[in-house]
Every structure is written in structure tokens, then in C-alpha cells.
Curated annotation (Swiss-Prot):
It comes from the Bacteria. The lineage of its organism: Bacteria, Bacillati, Cyanobacteriota, Cyanophyceae, Synechococcales. Disulfide bonds: none annotated. GO terms for cellular component: photosystem I; plasma membrane-derived thylakoid membrane. InterPro entries: PSI_Ycf4_assembly (IPR003359). This is Photosystem I assembly protein Ycf4. It is a multi-pass membrane protein. The chain crosses the membrane at residues 33-53, 74-94. One of its GO terms (biological process) is photosynthesis. Belongs to the Ycf4 family. The gene is ycf4. Seems to be required for the assembly of the photosystem I complex.
Length: 191
């Protein structure tokens, strides 16, 4: 999976009874770096607008006070507001850790539970293990690559198990898919 696999064997039994997989959400280093860069850019444009309006240099580099406020300063202010709004959205998504969750497969209870954190609530799907027909691996290369691991469930659409974002390495995707298919005792499709 895209995150740590924690397998919990049942006490007194050599076989695995439970498989838990945590899924990484929006709180990734790449998203945090992007939010920092957008915040700095938005503040820079906003301070340039204010410097142009007040006639004083508020930034240590350049001389934004020499810009005319009406055409250039005003446009810089609009860019600054747009940048700060985008940065606020990114920081809010990082704060709530959108998309984080877990995949729980429990042979003892015969249930699969998939949980993800949504915008305003926890999204959860539960279904019987016997309804799982296969583990599906999807690989598409090109401009917008796709490497996804999903469950094929009877009477439902395919349920994605991997995180959204940067594609997983192919070897890790194959290994995780084979491990899950072996645990669930179902076929591995798509390879």
C-alpha cells in the first residue's frame, strides 16, 4: 500500500486473521512545501501592493514603492489575494488531513471496513469479506499516470485502496496487491 502495513495475527493462531493498512492523506511533505511557497508568494504580492499604495518599501528586495498603484499595484494586490486564498485552502486541507484513513480486513468477523476522512465528516464503507471477488491492479503510464489498487466487490463499483497523488512504484504496487489477494484468498487482476 501507500503507507505502513500492520498485520495483527490472532492470539494462539498461526494464520493471519486481521490486516490493517493506513492510507496517507493530504498531510504530505510535498503539499506542505507547496502551501509554504504559495503563502510566501501571496504575501509577497500583497506587500508589493501595500508598498505601492503607501509609497514605502515593505519588502527588503526591490523597490515596490516606485510602482504606480492604479495599474501595477492593484493587479499585484489581486494576485496576492488570490494566492492567500489558495494558501488558506491548502492549509485547511493539510489541517484536516483530507483523504487519510485505513483499510481493515478482518477474517474473524468476516468484514471489510474502508474509512477515509472527507471535507466535513468521516466516510466509511463496510461490506462482507465474501463479497470481495478480486483485487484489481490498474496501471496507466503517460502524461497523467495511474497506479491504483482496488477491490472488485459484488454489486458495487470498484473500491480504491491506494492514496491519491504521486503514483506508487510498480514493484510496491504489485507486491501490495499480491499480498492482499493472498490474504483475502481471491484473484489478482490487471497484471
Amino acid at each position: 500500500m501507500s503507507a505502513d502495513l500492520q498485520e495483527t495475527p490472532k492470539a494462539g493462531d498461526a494464520s493471519l486473521e486481521r490486516l490493517e493498512q493506513s492510507v496517507l492523506g493530504f498531510r504530505r511533505l510535498s503539499n506542505q512545501l507547496l502551501a509554504v511557497i504559495v503563502t510566501i508568494g501571496g504575501l509577497g504580492f500583497t506587500l508589493t501592493c501595500l508598498s505601492s499604495y503607501l509609497g514605502r518599501d515593505l519588502l527588503p528586495i526591490g523597490s515596490p514603492s516606485s510602482l504606480l498603484f492604479v495599474p501595477q499595484g492593484l493587479v499585484m494586490g489581486l494576485y496576492g489575494i488570490a494566492g492567500l486564498l489558495l494558501a488558506s485552502y491548502l492549509w485547511a486541507m493539510i489541517n484536516i488531513n483530507l483523504g487519510a484513513g485505513s483499510n481493515n480486513f478482518d477474517k474473524a468477523s468476516g468484514m471489510v471496513k474502508i474509512c477515509r476522512r472527507g471535507y466535513f465528516k468521516l466516510i466509511s464503507a463496510e461490506f462482507p469479506l465474501k463479497d470481495v471477488k478480486a483485487v484489481k491492479v490498474e496501471v496507466r503510464d503517460g502524461f497523467n499516470p495511474l497506479r491504483r489498487l482496488s477491490l472488485r466487490v459484488q454489486g458495487r463499483r470498484d473500491i480504491t485502496l491506494t492514496r491519491v497523488g504521486q503514483p506508487l512504484p510498480l514493484a510496491q504496487l504489485e507486491q501490495d496487491g499480491a499480498e492482499l489477494a493472498r490474504f483475502l484468498d481471491v484473484n489478482l487482476e490487471g497484471l
